[in-house]
């Protein structure tokens, strides 16, 4: 399948100073023109939004982020501030939010660390250290435990082979070792699962999954479900899903954030904001294929007001 890409593109005829003036006007005086804010920020890409922020400061003498914070609230504010945050910094802030205070948002940690490329994870590590004066790994270790901690540390080390090379003998050996680490024995050698799933390249792993099915008569996902549990299981499944298809993985994250009663707004916002420029069109196609309904219709039915408006713009259309 040819990748379709994102819904948010660079605006043509872009003028940062004009945009800055429009935003100021939308927030000056009584009330706020939310439509004007959406009309600009949801229709510019990340780089352009940074230029608008600079222009706002140099021509108006105020900080755009501070103004947005004082004018907006709740989920709508969270989306707009997310759009205003440079990509890597956004991931870093989400990882920090997932670990700060009581409780841990395991789903967020898994989603970011399992889906980003090694290069992105290296940048996340650098930025995390700059922002908080300690390493991402330190925070993971103080906030999580056991095998779940180990898989997150392994993913955060960005040690995955980035090549495309396939060594047939090693591929067969990996499949056999996974089989022997789980299905074939009583108990599970969890470290074996971790080391293979966190270090091999995507092409290699896809072949390992096929070979695994051939020798065990089971999908690797089925084995992970029966052999592991809790957040460790969730992390391994996320790695496998991201290797098979990132758009399908994110479609599932979105579906789960909205199905049933209530909405997991943090997940909905994070996926919509972080994937809008990358693969939102592919996510939409996967969503429709997997769930028989469009992502657009799900968002429309699950959200309201300006929050709904801005998410639908990021979604980019109905299917």
UniProtKB/Swiss-Prot annotation:
It comes from the Eukaryota. Pfam families: Annexin (PF00191). The modification N6-acetyllysine is found at residues 213, 293, 300. The gene is Anxa4. Belongs to the annexin family. Calcium/phospholipid-binding protein which promotes membrane fusion and is involved in exocytosis. InterPro entries: Annexin, Annexin_repeat, Annexin_repeat_CS, Annexin_sf, ANX4. Annexin repeats lie at residues 14-85, 86-157, 169-241, 245-316. The modification Phosphoserine is found at residue 12. One of its GO terms (molecular function) is calcium-dependent protein binding. It is found in: Zymogen granule membrane. It is a peripheral membrane protein. SUPFAM superfamilies: Annexin. A pair of annexin repeats may form one binding site for calcium and phospholipid. One of its GO terms (cellular component) is perinuclear region of cytoplasm. Keywords: Acetylation, Annexin, Calcium, Calcium/phospholipid-binding, Cytoplasmic vesicle, Membrane, Phosphoprotein, Repeat. This is Annexin A4. Seems to bind one calcium ion with high affinity. The lineage of its organism: Eukaryota, Metazoa, Chordata, Craniata, Vertebrata. GO terms for biological process: epithelial cell differentiation; kidney development; negative regulation of interleukin-8 production; Notch signaling pathway; regulation of transcription by RNA polymerase II. The modification Phosphothreonine is found at residue 7.
């Amino acid at each position: 399948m040819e990748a379709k890409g994102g819904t948010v593109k660079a605006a043509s005829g872009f003028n940062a100073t004009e945009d800055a003036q429009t935003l100021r006007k939308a927030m000056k005086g009584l009330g706020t023109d939310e439509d004007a804010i959406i009309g600009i920020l949801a229709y510019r890409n990340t780089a352009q939004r940074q230029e608008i922020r600079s222009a706002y400061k140099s021509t108006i003498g105020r900080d755009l982020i501070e103004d947005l914070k004082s004018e907006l609230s709740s989920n709508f504010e969270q989306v707009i501030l997310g759009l205003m945050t440079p990509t890597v910094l956004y991931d870093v802030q989400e990882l920090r939010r997932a670990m700060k205070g009581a409780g841990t948002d395991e789903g967020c940690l898994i989603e970011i660390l399992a889906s980003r490329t090694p290069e992105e994870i290296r940048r996340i590590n650098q930025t995390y250290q700059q922002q908080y004066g300690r390493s991402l790994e330190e925070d993971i270790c103080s906030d999580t435990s056991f095998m779940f901690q180990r898989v997150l540390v392994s993913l955060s080390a960005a040690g995955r082979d980035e090549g495309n090379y396939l060594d047939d003998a090693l591929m067969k050996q990996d499949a056999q070792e996974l089989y022997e680490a789980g299905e074939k024995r009583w108990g599970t050698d969890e470290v074996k699962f971790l080391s293979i799933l966190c270090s091999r390249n995507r092409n290699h792993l896809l072949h390992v999954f096929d070979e695994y099915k051939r020798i065990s008569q089971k999908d690797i996902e089925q084995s992970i479900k029966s052999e592991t549990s809790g957040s460790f299981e969730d992390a391994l499944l996320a790695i496998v899903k991201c290797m098979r298809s990132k758009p399908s993985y994110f479609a599932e994250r979105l579906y789960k954030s909205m199905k049933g009663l209530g909405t997991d707004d943090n997940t909905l916002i994070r996926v919509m904001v972080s994937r809008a420029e990358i693969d939102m069109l592919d996510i939409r196609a996967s969503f429709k294929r997997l769930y028989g309904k469009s992502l657009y219709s799900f968002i429309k039915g699950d959200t309201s007001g300006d929050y709904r408006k801005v998410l639908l713009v990021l979604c980019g259309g109905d299917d």
